[in-house]
Amino acid sequence: MDAHAATLLRVSLAVVFIWFGILKPLGYSVANELVERTVYWFDPGWFIPFLGWWEVLIGVTLLVRPWIRVAVLLLLLQMPGTFLPLVLLPDVCWVRAPWAPSLEGQYIIKNLVLISAAIAVGGTVRPDIRRGRDLPARPPANV
């Protein structure tokens, strides 16, 4: 399982970002109204498609191993904004703050998993640094 975990996590993240991202410029994302109400200072006519294509770019860069660092950077720049509705739209995001999020609030809070997964995937870029150059990747089987 360990041999494929990072690849599966990376591809899964890519699928989510490409899929959910492309829905925004096409006008099919259930999050479009939430985005529009949250960042009301931007014209949604250009901002929602821009955000969608940004997410697609995150997904595509996750699929190309040498670009993983770019993907993580793009994701970390984008993700803080996804939490804004929890503060700016409490009537939409909470049934009873801070313990009972609405469906929209749950949709936002699950982004913690996406951030953590991206950090885990980013950690696979240079495993020799994480483990030390002279250490074996795994302990011997008889230990």
Which residues make up each language-model segment?
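Membrane-interface extramembranous regions
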Residues: 1-143
